[in-house]
Amino acid sequence: MKKIINMTILVVFTYVSAILPAYSAQCTNDTWNKVMKRGKLVVGAKADYKPWGFKDSSGKIIGMEADMAQAVADIMGVDLELVAVQSSNRMQFLEQGKIDLMIATMSDRKDRRKIVGIIQPNYYTSGTNVMSPKALGLKTWEDLRGKPVCGKQGAFYNKIVAERYGAKIVAFTGNAEAKQALRDKKCIAWVYDDSSIMSDLSSGNFNDFEMPFNSEDDNPWGLAVPLGEVNCVFGNFMSGLSFMMHQNGTLMELEKKWGIQATAYLKAKNKEYGDWLAGK
């Protein structure tokens, strides 16, 4: 990991230096300058979504996204402070200046790009999948055809598996009820967002279950800087760093470290951004 970070430092700073002149006229770079002067980067991260962001026994926030935040701070040469955020307040914290950067399992959506500066390329993704008992040995989505599948009322995942694969949806008012019905064998699987499923599988409460399929319907995640800095030093720095984390395999390495089921998305990005002459 350290070797990868050190290799990234030179490349990212070279990239940022190259784009600085183009944006210097219209950018104040307030957040970037504040971080560098203060010597500390404040990052908003989830603290209740294992394994991406959660608290250990000492109360420290750890996880894949916490490691990403540490890598950013290391490359900037500053200390790191992690602030726990929730889906309901993460963008507001960034808008209000309570955090400098947000890495918090946030889906990249058009409406959100009007509020915060979502960086490209997206660093991760979530999608549709199911959790099912290992004993059933489900292999493909077609295994759901004609079978009862538990879901949460109103979730769009239900419609996807019903129309695409002919599953018979058994809808419940909440996910807790749906997962209990799965335990009670009222259905062969629970359909939902794969990151939520992975969080459950990482909790230790579902050791007899698995996520058997390749996820579908990618919903990319974006880290974010303040909106006014997305095309300035900080935004371009983070864009270059996100690119490098894909290219050099850092994100795949972190995924493996935290026991997250390998995603086709990271593999595809690593290949897409890879050096075509590598190994030749």
Show the residue positions of the predicted features.
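Ligand-binding clefts/hinges and TM-proximal coupling segments of bilobed small-molecule sensing domains
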Residues: A25-Q26, T31, Y157-F172, D208-F213, ...
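Acidic, polar ligand-binding/catalytic clefts
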Residues: Q70, D74, D79-D143, D208-E210, ...
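Ligand-binding cleft/hinge of the Venus flytrap
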Residues: F54-S57, A69-V78, W141, G154-G174, ...
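Periplasmic-binding protein-like
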Residues: Y124-S132, M198, S202-S242, Q261-K280
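Extended ligand-binding regions for polar small-molecule ligands
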Residues: D67-I75, L138, E142, K147-P148, ...
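Alpha-to-beta junction loops
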Residues: L41-V42, V78-D79, Q96-A104, P148-V149, ...
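Short helix-initiation/N-cap motifs at beta->coil->alpha
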Residues: A66, E81-Q92, L136, G154-F156, ...
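Extracytoplasmic small-molecule ligand-binding "clamshell" domains
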Residues: A25-T105
